[in-house]
Amino acid sequence: MDRERTNLLPTPFSIAVLLTFITFILALFLAEPTIKGNHLIELLSSWEKGLWNPPLLVFALQMMLMLVIGHVVALSGPIDSLIKKITIYCTNTAKSAAIITFFTVFVALFNWGLGLIFGAIFARKVGEHAIKNKLSLNYPLIGAAGYSGLMVWHGGISGSAPIKIAEAGHFLEHKMGVISQSNTIFSSMNILASVLLLIILPVFMYFLGKKHDINNISINLDISKKENISKRIEGVEKIDHSKILAYIFGGVILFFSFYKAFIIPDNISLNIITPNYINFVLLGIALVMHKNFYNFLAAVNDAIKGASGILIQFPLYFGIMGVMSYSGMVEMLSTFFVNISNETTFPIFTFLSAGIVNIFVPSGGGQWAVQGPIIIEAANQLAISIPKSVMALAYGDQITNMLQPFWALPLLGITGLKASEILPYTIKLFLIGIIIFVSVLLIF
């Protein structure tokens, strides 16, 4: 699986390092040194400051927690039971593809980590169901349906750019202020886009399943029941396995989340939705759903592996942003966009450029750190709606996830599929998504 991915592109870490070198080379030729003879040292200093920029490191941890805790929720018993109940309606490829796509997109609009793992587990359960009941199933198409949530997540409640700019003290506040999610995620433009995606994508996958209704489960899905080996719990271990303690702790978190959102404020507002608030709520839900700390921590140990990319790559992107800001490249690129754009074309150019950047920077948070300053500077110069510009970037970032295999790795591991098997179908989702997103950007 990893070998196949690296045949398409280098590892995301290698790409981040290469982008760092490219940024340095461009900055050396484009930027004027403030101290003669020390230009390289100045660039290295700005890079080092960017690596460990405190607000950006907080942002990285917030995104990492959002992925991990969302993954933990997806591994809980209630989610597993829900998937099993829905699976009984998946009797052929067309129905299965439509049902998985709808629920995966719906869940991903709430949390991208949850949507990613939910879709992967759902796809595998449907494959196991087909084998058990001797049903014909195009398993790669089902895998693609389980990955569809990654083309809608940035327009959802956990979208990196929209939730970050809704938080006081974000790193671009001095250029754009704090923008509520009522102007981004819950804007009429994005609500229309989300509704269209929820309707069109499942319908499209249904007819795609009708057209490609072939029996293609070429991998070995173990459907045998695993024997549960009971272990005698003694002494202080009882604390780790205590349902009461997990329910109380998780319940207190959920109670205060509700109290903070609906009781404390004089007016209920979407401003409450910040990265910290989302993670706080997810933590409470995860603790309650796993019923004890032992199960919760076991799920965390499983989920944390998927967050390694955020942990090690985000600082490199922050360093790139530091060099670009110091060297004046942000202003240069912004001026370029201003010169070739107008009020109508700027959101489209933003969407397309974000899609291209996402191929090389497969992280919404990392991309926002690098491209966000350029987009906001250009939008300010053109006097164009900043919320719309942010959403155009979000749409572009998420759509090319259907081409970029980085975030598909957890799904490929869970389903046993290869990237080359799901790619023919995710490319079709990519094309449908472009039509939807460009249309709403032009309408509004």
Task: Please name every model-derived segment.
Residues A94-A108, N133-I157, G177, Q181-S182, ...:
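Alpha-helical transmembrane segments of multi-pass membrane proteins
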Residues P12-A27, P140-I163, Q313-Y317:
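Hydrophobic alpha-helical membrane-insertion segments
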Residues Y89-F122, L311-S327, V338-E377, A394:
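Hydrophobic alpha-helical transmembrane segments of multi-pass integral membrane proteins
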Residues T11, W52-A60, T87-I99, K132-L141, ...:
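Membrane-interfacial loop-to-helix junctions in multi-pass transporters
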Residues A123-N215, A408-V440:
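Membrane-core helix-loop-helix motifs of multi-pass transport proteins
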Residues A74-I99, K210-K231, I310, Y317, ...:
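Cytoplasmic juxtamembrane regions at transmembrane-helix boundaries
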Residues M1-L65, F186-I199, V203-G309, Q313, ...:
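Hydrophobic transmembrane alpha-helices of multi-pass small-molecule transporters
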Residues G50, P54-L56, L61-A168, F360:
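Early transmembrane hairpin of solute transport permeases
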